[in-house]
């Protein structure tokens, strides 16, 4: 074997054992952890096979039938198939909807939509981050523009009602009449209730705005029909592909075709979104698409049509409801008083800890969550909650009784965290002091025992991996 052949043909474990060892440790971590991050999931072996394939080798700037490189016969076939399966996964008529499957990730996809629809400094409204929105919907504070979206465009937030935790549609409508946005974004990252898309459509129409729905978190639930679909009301729908959808890491943009509305004289006005959005994706913001990802996405979208997939998504919602009930039994306050989707947002302040402390203690017992703002928070940088999602562990086989056990473990860990916080002196009780005292948890028998129980339990459920 030549030296070049040795480089090209030697398996990873032999050629680069350092990287292979890190990957093995990550596989072990995933296998032995209860993963509750709502934006994470475990994709299938078939999807991973497609990701690590020859489709990664090909360059293909452009779109099917209009490439800037030769040799794209089969790349065209896979991208076209992916588009067809994307429309089928959401029961969409190709005469009324198109889709771009080249987007690299969710936040860039949103930016591509904004740029396609309006010029720099155009106006958009999105749900405020502390209310459960997403950075890419134009988040900014009183003193700083955080998301680049708020730099390139003029953004104004709408918020939840502080008393109910639900989107305040009346205030949104009032503010929209004053702000006159070109785009109204209906989408969330930590809002657990259903969005009233019909009301959003009515508000958008009242100011002649486009309704852009970001269903990144819930697209799997929408595809399976376990929650209402936004497509009846939206002009554009964006989604990531790796959260509840359970595909590879990527994104899609769906756009309307055909008649949009009639003007005051009764003349038809047609959508012109397709060319604008496609141009915004390529060449506006991207070069060559990631063909291995598009291939893997095609595989995942076929899985969306399987009865087992629909059963899985129904179980995701059932498991989230169990989490709601169990947290309430233990006296926790939940944002919006519960969930209709795949996650609950738990306010842990009443336990005497904040989101960051809760996240760290839970990680030490192999329960992986993320700190998150709750509507009552004054700052997105000091969150009082944790976000608990059910898609990942439902993929591995968790049912209702398993999530009862999950909530019990969380409650025990947070009780420990609160007691540890109380032991800190008043002049040294900040997060860094808490983490310093906590260390890796090895000096606390209670944490060691919890970690052992969780790791053994989680490891008993299957995980699709190559290790």
From Swiss-Prot:
Keywords carried by this UniProt record: Cytoplasm, One-carbon metabolism, Pyridoxal phosphate, Transferase
Protein's GO biological process: glycine biosynthetic process from serine; tetrahydrofolate interconversion; tetrahydrofolate metabolic process
EC class of the enzyme, as a word: transferase
Keyword Nucleotide-binding included in the entry's annotation: no
Subcellular location: Cytoplasm
Post-translational modification N6-(pyridoxal phosphate)lysine, affected residues: 243
A GO CC term assigned to this protein in UniProt: mitochondrion
Reactions catalysed according to its record: (6R)-5,10-methylene-5,6,7,8-tetrahydrofolate + glycine + H2O = (6S)-5,6,7,8-tetrahydrofolate + L-serine
GO molecular function, one term: glycine hydroxymethyltransferase activity
UniProt keyword NAD present: no
Domain of life of the organism encoding this protein: Eukaryota
EC number: 2.1.2.1
Primary location recorded for the protein, binned into one broad class: cytoplasm
Obligatory cofactor(s): pyridoxal 5'-phosphate
Associated pathway: One-carbon metabolism; tetrahydrofolate interconversion
Subunit structure: Homotetramer.
Entry-linked HAMAP family: SHMT (MF_00051)
General function of this protein: Interconversion of serine and glycine.
Family indicated by similarity: Belongs to the SHMT family.
The protein's name: Probable serine hydroxymethyltransferase, cytosolic
Source organism of the structure: Schizosaccharomyces pombe (strain 972 / ATCC 24843)
């Amino acid at each position: 074997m030549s030296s070049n052949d040795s480089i090209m043909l030697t398996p990873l474990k032999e050629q680069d054992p350092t990287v292979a060892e890190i990957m093995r440790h990550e596989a072990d971590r995933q296998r032995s952890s209860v993963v509750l991050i709502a934006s994470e999931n475990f994709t299938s072996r078939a999807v991973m096979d497609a990701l690590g394939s020859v489709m990664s080798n090909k360059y293909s700037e452009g779109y099917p039938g209009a490439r800037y490189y030769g040799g794209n016969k089969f790349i065209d076939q896979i991208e076209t198939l992916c588009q067809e399966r994307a429309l089928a996964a959401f029961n969409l008529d190709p005469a009324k909807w198109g889709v771009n499957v080249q987007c690299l990730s969710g936040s860039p996809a949103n930016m591509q939509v904004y740029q396609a629809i309006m010029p720099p400094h155009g106006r958009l409204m999105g749900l405020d981050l502390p209310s459960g929105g997403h950075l890419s919907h134009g988040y900014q504070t009183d003193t700083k523009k955080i998301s680049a979206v708020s730099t390139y465009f003029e953004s104004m937030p709408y918020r939840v009602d502080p008393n109910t935790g639900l989107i305040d549609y009346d205030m949104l409508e009032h503010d929209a009449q004053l702000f006159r946005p070109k785009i109204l974004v209906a989408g969330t990252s930590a809002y657990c209730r259903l969005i009233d898309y019909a009301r959003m459509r009515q508000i958008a129409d009242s100011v002649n705005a486009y309704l852009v729905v970001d269903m990144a978190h819930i697209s799997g639930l929408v595809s399976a029909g376990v929650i209402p679909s936004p497509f009846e009301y939206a002009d554009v729908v964006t989604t990531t592909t790796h959260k509840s959808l359970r595909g590879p890491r990527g994104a899609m943009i769906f756009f309307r075709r055909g008649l949009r509305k009639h003007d005051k004289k009764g003349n038809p006005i047609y959508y012109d979104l397709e060319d604008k959005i496609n141009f915004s994706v390529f060449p506006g913001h991207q070069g060559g698409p990631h063909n291995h990802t598009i291939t893997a996405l095609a595989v995942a979208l076929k899985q969306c049509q399987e009865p087992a997939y629909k059963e899985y998504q129904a179980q995701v919602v059932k498991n989230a409801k169990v989490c709601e009930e169990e947290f309430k039994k233990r006296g926790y306050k939940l944002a919006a008083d519960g969930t209709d989707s795949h996650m609950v947002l738990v306010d842990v302040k009443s336990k005497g800890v904040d989101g960051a402390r809760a996240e760290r203690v839970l990680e030490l017992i192999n329960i992986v969550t993320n700190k998150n703002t709750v509507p009552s928070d004054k700052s997105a940088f000091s969150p009082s909650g944790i976000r608990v999602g059910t898609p990942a562990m439902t993929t591995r086989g968790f049912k209702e009784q398993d999530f009862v056990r999950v909530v019990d473990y969380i409650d025990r860990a947070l009780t420990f965290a609160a007691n540890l916080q109380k032991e800190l002196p008043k002049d040294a009780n900040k997060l860094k002091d808490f983490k310093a005292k906590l260390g890796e948890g090895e000096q606390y028998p209670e944490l060691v025992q919890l970690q052992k129980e969780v790791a053994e339990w989680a490891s008993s459920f299957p995980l699709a991996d190559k290790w």
